[in-house]
Amino acid sequence: MEVKTFAFLQIAVFIALGAQIFLAGTDALSDEDELFSVEYCGTNCTKQDTGSWTTCSGNCTCYHEDGKKVGLCLSTEYTDFTKFPKPTSEEIANARPLPKREKTLN
């Protein structure tokens, strides 16, 4: 009896988790007006003997895990496209790539 109850609870949790993952995935796909980007700055940061971390250059920030002595310098940017006006048809047409030109021999 206990085995059947335990198996039933495992199946119920599995179904609930699957539904949650599906709903979270479809919600993330509908957020086309927001963009969060992360770029590696090409350098690492290290924990010094004093407990402080070396600084990253430019717009980069040191991100590290607890207990580790080496971190990554990363640049993060959040863009909310709802703050920008919708482009007009003319602006969209002007932004299209130009067709390839064929090279001519002189």
From Swiss-Prot:
The keyword Transit peptide does not apply. Keywords: Disulfide bond, Glycoprotein, Secreted, Signal. Residues 1-28 form the signal peptide. Glycans are attached at N44, N59. Its main location: secreted. One of its GO terms (cellular component) is extracellular region. GO terms for molecular function: C-X-C chemokine binding. Salivary chemokine-binding protein which binds to host chemokines CXCL1, CXCL2, CXCL5 and CXCL8. This is Evasin P1132. It comes from Ixodes ricinus.
